[in-house]
Amino acid sequence: IQLLSNIKRVVTADFLDKETYGYVGDVSHIQTPILEQMLDNQMLPVLASIGYSKEGDMLNINADYLATAVAIALNAKKLVLMTDVKGVLENGEVLDSLTSKEFQEKIDQGIITGGMIPKIESAVNTVLAGVGEVLIGDNLVTGTSIIS
């Protein structure tokens, strides 16, 4: 297993707002040839949620945003976002699937709140960008499938 973000600068990022957030960034580019070569050689790339600015500053990146950017860049068929809950919950039950329209409705109803909002928002954007499915779930890979 190789950690690539620190060694080969696989991820280029832009500062979100240096004065407000400090060294926090958003993905601007993924060096896909390095990742594709590893995958072609049956290797599993492991990326830290770190990117580098054009000036060489190391920037923290939200892990879900990085994962979705990599999935889009690699034209992945599926992305699994691991979390500490079994999936998107409604009344304590895991939803089997969720569309972008249902996502907004459930936010408006107060069903989806807090840290799950940016996770699902990035998942919805990933599906809309062409990744076939995003699964949000726990280490047992039960979960909620985000579909278009």
Language-model features: locations:
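C-terminal catalytic "cap/lid" subdomain
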Residues: 1-148
